[in-house]
Amino acid sequence: MKLFDYQEKALALTSDKDNSAFYYDMGLGKTFIGSERLRLYGKRVNIVVCQKSKIKDWCEHFKEHYTDYAVFDLTNKKDMQAFMVYPIYKCIGIINYELAYRREELRKLKDFTMMLDESSMIKNETAKRTKFMLSLKPSHTILLSGTPTDGKYEFLYSQLRLLGWKITKTAYYNRYIKTELRSYGGPTFRVVTGYKNVSELKAKLKEYGAVFAKAEEVIKLPEKKFIKEYSTVSSDYKKFMKDRIIKIDDKELTGDSTLSKRLYARMLCSAYSKDKISRLIDLVNSTSDRVIIFYNFNTELEALKKAVSDRPISIVNGQVKDLKAYENNDNSVTLIQYQAGAMGLNLQKAN
């Protein structure tokens, strides 16, 4: 597999590291860098933990580019059983974060490489999935993320432990995190107010195998490619197309004409599609850059606002033109109704 120069450089920088982390902007090929590092570690048994919407992509990636490995979808119980007893040959098991900690069999693995795609998913140390990942004993760990901390270094601690840095949380906070005690008439609690010794922290990250790259730092970028995300057809959509009527969230959709049937069918494929919304959330969470989302219907707008409620939101439609979040927050999400955004908008900040 032919890699770009900056990808080869990333592998060279981690060639002497037992663990590695590739904190690269979206579009710089973390998938290829991570899978090559996995191959170079040379373990017979390997697991990849990713977001649910990415399982199929990872399976296809390894099947296409690493034909000497047996690939198992560990969300499938039969594949899981086969993976745990697979003899002799090299194998890769792929599973999502939400299911991994329920697969107790994985604790039995020894002498294996573990790769975490979007490793920012384990930033919460008290979450079951984070505790489970920290309990495993891989020979090598690979972390991939475009947003390892989203600018908040207190969320980096669990990833540092996976990279092999044996620093206590107390020592980490005392050295790198500024905090203070506050009380608003109730119990006293500690809040993060800033950071210190950041240059030293970044140097430590590199020492333990972390490599960083922003898109603008890579001189020879590959030609841009459009990547399609496919969502599954829901049972609600199938039922509506058959019966022309369905009730969702106390709302009855009736396709009593060709036009209304087509209109509601489109809604069922967007605002009412749980799989599509889930994939969108995963996509937004994979970057800390500005994101632009175009939509058609008000029902879509409400679903989108709920889905990305943890990010600063701007909205442009026939009734509202609010671009404050877009202008002032580099991690904002801008929701634009197709017709309202057809002309007259400069959105170049969203690279």
Region locations from a protein language model:
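Conserved pre-motif I regulatory segment
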Residues: 1-23
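Walker A/P-loop
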Residues: 17-37
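Conserved Walker A/P-loop ATP-binding site and its immediately adjacent core
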Residues: 33, 43-64, 150-155, 296-299
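Conserved P-loop NTPase motor "coupling/switch" region that bridges the ATPase
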Residues: 44-45, 113, 121, 130-216
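Conserved helix-turn-beta segment of the N-terminal RecA-like "Helicase ATP-binding" lobe
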Residues: 54-77, 163-167
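Conserved helix/coil segment N-terminal to the catalytic DExD/H
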Residues: 79-113
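Conserved helicase ATPase core of P-loop NTP-dependent helicases/translocases
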Residues: 81-82, 292-294, 301-341
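Conserved helicase/translocase motor-coupling segment
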Residues: 216-309
